[in-house]
Every structure is written in structure tokens, then in C-alpha cells.
Amino acid sequence: MKVYLHDVNRGLGVFLLAVSFLLPGCSSSGGRRASVPVTVDATAQVVEQARQTWLQEHPNWSFYGRAAIRQGSDGGSVRVEWEQHGRGYRIVLSAPMSRQSWVLSGSSSGPARLEGVGGWVRVGEVAEQVLFEATGWQVPMGLLPDWVRGRNSDSGGGDVQLDAEGRPHRVYQGGWQLRFLDWFPSSVGRPMLPRQIEASRGSARIRLIVDQWDELIP
């Protein structure tokens, strides 16, 4: 995964913030807007249920994308690459202009490892805590793999508003609000997947554009 940040001195912190917003994550920006009820017909409900089933049955995937990030008056852009193998993940970040790079890897059921330029390593049992100690950011790593694919979270507790196709349109969970702005159409052997996602929480804003989705071989 490659990351390009205008402010490289804060690259890791901004990137990790970006990742937390990227994934079908929720974001909350000071309150929910009143929503207009959407009618989802029976056919769309069946298609969406089939999509959710497919996502559950295909836990190995990766995506490449771009994100615009803003935290208060600070902003930048990033390249993102994420690989997920079931419960395990590996995220590689690099800022070519500053020659900085980071690798975050681990599992939702095991320890997380964060490696940075110069060989420093931080390891912990909980990914959220590892990232917080390194950056000061709270990143809901346990929810991101579901959010980024528009999958109903196994952890529950969220509020999901659907579009006319029966897909997630807005998601509110864990203090985050997420909006799905565009989707890749379904193709042979693969259902619709998010193409453009916008997330916000307080003064933080992220817009993710996914360039490519891939299914990984176990």
C-alpha cells in the first residue's frame, strides 16, 4: 500500500486516521440528518441478501485506492492498499517523497504489529491500542473489514440506512458516520462493491475512491 501525504511529518498519524475512515466505517459529524424513508422492493432485497452471503463466503480480499483526508486545518492525500485473509490483515504504507513506509499486520483474534522506517516495531494484543499508542488516534480496526465492503458488521450495534437497491447508504456505528456514494456494478462471480465512500467524525473528513477490488486465493 502506498501513501502520499502532503505533511509527511504527520504521515503515519494522518494515514491511520484515513484508514479508520476508509473502511466502511461510520463517522459521526455532530449529529444525524433526518433521512427520507426508502422503499426497497422484494427483488432488491433478495439481491442484497445474496451479496451479503457472498461477502461472508469470501473472506479473502484486497483493494487499492485513493483517499483525500482532512483533520481540522490539516489535509493530504493517500494511496491505500489493504489485504485481508479471513481474520488476518496486512496494510503497507509508503510516502515516496519522504521515503517513509509502515506496515501494519495482525489478526482480529491475535496480536497486531506495526513496523516503521528505521526498523522500529510496536506489538500489542489489540490493534486499536497499538495504533493509539503510536499515533494518538482511536481506529476501530475490528469493524473496518466489514465497513469497507459494505457488509453488515458481525459486532452489531449499528444503525444502517439503505438505498433503493437495498445496499447500505449511511451507517452509524461507534460514533462514526459513513456514506456510500458510488458502487462498482456486479460482474461475473462478484456482486456490487463500494467504489466511493465518505466518512466523517467531528472535524475529520475522508473520501475514499477504490480503484480495484481483488479476491485473494486462500
UniProtKB/Swiss-Prot annotation:
CDD domains: LolB
Signal peptide: 1-25
Record's subcellular location: Cell outer membrane
Lipid attachment locations (S-diacylglycerol cysteine): 26
SUPFAM superfamilies: Prokaryotic lipoproteins and lipoprotein localization factors (SSF89392)
Keywords, ordered alphabetically: Cell outer membrane, Chaperone, Lipoprotein, Membrane, Palmitate, Protein transport, Signal, Transport
GO biological process: lipoprotein localization to outer membrane; protein transport
Membrane topology designation: Lipid-anchor
Superkingdom: Bacteria
Residues with a covalently attached lipid (N-palmitoyl cysteine): 26
GO cellular component: cell outer membrane
Claim: Protein transport is one of the keywords in the record: yes
Subunit composition and interactions: Monomer.
NCBIfam families according to UniProt: lolB
Sequence similarity: Belongs to the LolB family.
Function: Plays a critical role in the incorporation of lipoproteins in the outer membrane after they are released by the LolA protein.
Protein name as annotated: Outer-membrane lipoprotein LolB
Lineage: Bacteria, Pseudomonadati, Pseudomonadota, Gammaproteobacteria, Lysobacterales
